[in-house]
Amino acid sequence: MKKVLLVGAGPAGLMAAEVLSAAGVEVHVYDAMPSVGRKFLLAGKGGLNLTHSEPPAIFVTRYGKRQAQIAALLQDFGGKAVREWAGTLGVETFVGTSGRVFPLDMKAAPLLRAWLQRLRHPTRGPAVQFHMRHRWTGRAGEPSADEVGIGLVFDSPKGELSAHGDAVLLALGGASWARLGSDGAWVPWLQTRGVEIAPLLPANCGFDVANTVRTGPGATARGWSPYFASQFAGQPFKSVAISFTTTSGARFARKGEFVATASGVEGSLVYAASSLFRDEIMSQGAATFYLDLLPDLSLEHVLAQVRHPRGSRSLSSHLKSRLHIDGIKVAILHEMMSKEQINDPLQLASAIKALALTLAAARPIDEAISSAGGVQFEALDPNLMLTRWPGVFCAGEMLDWEAPTGGYLLTACLASGRSAAQGVLSYLSRSIS
């Protein structure tokens, strides 16, 4: 029986293990964490977004510069296949109003339990064997006289040990949420073998705004004023729109919501544009987008309401009465505008429809939902095997791709794990012949 060493017990690794075990391969899964699927469970805390229901032709566009490579992976395991697979685990799914697909109970734990039950007690093929608290050291072990194939060296609770298999599949994740296992430590290990790796960068991340206190006490290089940060951090901007054009001409415009943080912004609308913001900051030093606080109203209508006589009412009361702007939406206007500007009806109306916010930096990668960069597809053959390390395959977020939230991340991880496992099977069949 052929044996495969699989490093990484996240979604990509578990899917690869399922495919290999069902094909009759002895699979040993190694992971540095005490239990399986740590990041997967965290992703399901607010509702496990399995995939998206949109048509495949639109679905693949979410992968940006790598959509051609990801499209090849999704051909056999796209959104529809993910739902069908979940069904085989006894997990029914539904499509939310946004087109996102969730389990009926919204939870990740029941799906993971059913999945592990299948892997540990399969109806066909050998049981997958799990070795937790085993951290790959980045070193390859030398086989002894009675061993063949590829060896890896692990740090384990019992000390350093070597394991050998006929092939290796790496599903080590990116570099976000290091405490859950994805720490990016593997990057220099593969680089020393000549593997081309794009730098790991934060994706689906928050950003620090450029300083809004320009001079005087409290002035900082970046971040909100002390008052705004203390009063409004954690509050959402609801029913707004943002628009952004990069210096190279790429455009983004979308309605939705996001959240103010102590130093900037985060949330679904920001995440959707995060790759553009990040790359603009890296090339230009900053990124300025425009916030529309009332996307369903025209500038002319807003201006008319701002100019409407307000009598003895305060400006805040006037805006709340005429335009239903209050709370954080009023606060951001005061944060970004001078007293003279905010008392000028035309400047105020223009700011309500297009308030410029400048982002100074992406938040650290360890805070990001996911990461961009990784093993470049040019370093892999069509079966996801490293050309510089024959018999070693890669899958999941450690590959050089990124996608927004919405089910695209998990779908591509599952699809790449499945594809890499099929590549392993092809490799093993060739080695037999």
Predicted regions, residues:
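A conserved FAD-binding loop/helix module that cradles the flavin
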Residues: 176-189, 193, 400-432
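Short beta-strand to alpha-helix junction loop
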Residues: 70-78, 97-117, 177-182, 208-212, ...
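A conserved beta-strand/loop capping segment in the N-terminal third of enzymes
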Residues: 41-110, 243
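Glycine-rich FAD pyrophosphate-binding loop
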Residues: 21-45
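Residue-level recognition of phosphate/Mg2+-coordinating polar/acidic sites
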Residues: 22-23, 35, 56-58, 75, ...
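Residue-level detector of alpha-helix initiation sites
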Residues: 6, 10-11, 174-176, 399
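N-terminal Rossmann-like FAD-binding beta1-loop-alpha1 element of flavoenzymes
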Residues: 2-29, 420, 424-425
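Predominantly flavin-linked oxidoreductase catalytic cores and closely associated redox partners
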Residues: 110, 118-320
